[in-house]
Amino acid sequence: WLIKTNQSGLMDWNVCLGTNYNDRAGQAIQTQDGGFILVGGKAQNSNDNTNVWVIKTNSQGDTTWTQSFGGSESDSGTDILVDENGGYVILGDTESYGNGGKDIYVIKTDLYGEQEWSKTYGGGSDDSGQSIIKASDGGYIIRYIVESFGAGNSSVGILKISQDGDEIWSKTIGGSYGIPGNSLQYIDNGNYVMICS
């Protein structure tokens, strides 16, 4: 459900996007042409398995194109950003590809949602991408929930990848009871700050 409001919070328009099954909404951002691009999960059928779903709309919420990515298992998108080199970088998680369980799933597309490359990251347990931001050197920093590595239960992970999706480094933070990360921001001089609970 995409809703546009004015500065007073009054609704200008709204549009419902999806199938007759349980689709999932992730992130939505405004694009340079005044439209919007959304990422989430499109239900494959009634069994609740989804594919990563990207929807591009114009400034009034009318769909201009859609793309879906993934395999026969459940895959979903959680975040998206506009790449400075053109196109979009999509973050999510996949059960169709990777090392088993749920893995981090990154897809790079052109301006029309055509895939240029995709990569997975993670171990044999569940690792789920939560948010992605641009790094100062042109790569990307990913915040994720990790069970494959770290101190046990659900720890927070930070993953640095290049602009081509190659892993540069990864870190995990957390204790035996788990520490979910809630926000990741670039501050200055190549440094980052993360809020956890």
Question: In which residue ranges do the predicted regions lie?
Answer:
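A sequence-level/structural motif corresponding to short, flexible coil/turn segments enriched
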Residues: 1-197
